A protein has these predicted regions:
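Acidic, turn/loop-rich segments in luminal/extracellular domains of secretory-pathway
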Residues: 1-36
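Mature N-terminal segment immediately following signal peptide/propeptide cleavage
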Residues: 56-61
Length: 207
């Protein structure tokens, strides 16, 4: 694993492959550029994770900055995201601003955190969310954990991915027909890796 701790700039290295019979491939060269993070954020709990760079990118683009305790930042990669948190980050990633509102119109408005209300209204107005039908009315359920299926629907609507033929993709059972198109669409553009998650995992919370 190439881990040039504290290094910046460009580098390259050349390699060959040798098979069991001693045949040597033509050399191949890999060139890399290591740039300093603009945000100054480096997560203490993401060392060695392939997702560390993506986590830092979220901070640099103002989408999400983890908790700062003392002089260290923590991304908390195992913490399950709430519906409100995911919708807010998804909208921020697409440069969709939160509405300046005090009330959302959802029946569970009182339980929606103040910071999430503007995002809830923006998401509703943009057709990104429609809420959950309950006996009391349509609820946003900002504090509930968001599942991978629900997240796929949100991202599909935000990205406006062209619908694909469902028969070409490994989508889910009849119980998840409501999200199958979104999942297949995201698989077609490599947002979700086809076959990576089981049906049960797609129903689990996003971390």
């Amino acid at each position: 694993v190439y881990t040039p701790g504290g290094k910046l700039g460009t580098d390259s290295f050349t390699y060959t492959a040798i098979d069991a019979y001693g045949n040597i491939s033509l050399p191949a060269t890999v060139s890399i550029t290591i740039e300093k993070a603009n945000s100054g954020v480096c997560y203490a709990d993401m060392g060695g994770s392939r997702a560390h760079t993506a986590a830092v990118d979220l901070a640099e683009h103002g989408v999400f900055v983890g908790a700062k305790i003392g002089d260290s930042y923590f991304f908390e990669p195992e913490r399950t995201l709430s519906r409100g948190e995911f919708v807010a980050m998804a909208l921020a990633a697409m440069d969709v601003s939160a509405e300046d509102v005090q009330m959302t119109g959802f029946c569970d408005d009182a339980s929606i955190p103040t910071w999430a209300k503007g995002y809830a209204v923006s998401a509703l107005n943009a057709g990104v969310v429609s809420g959950v039908s309950t006996a009391e009315g349509v609820a946003f359920r900002a504090n509930d954990a968001i599942t991978l299926n629900e997240a796929a629907v949100v991202l599909n609507r935000l990205l406006r991915v062209t619908d694909v033929d469902l028969s070409d993709y490994d989508v889910q059972d009849a119980d998840n027909a409501w999200c199958a198109q979104a999942v297949a669409n995201l698989q077609s553009v490599s947002v979700i890796e086809s076959g990576r998650f089981s049906t049960d995992e797609m129903r689990s919370g996003v971390t």
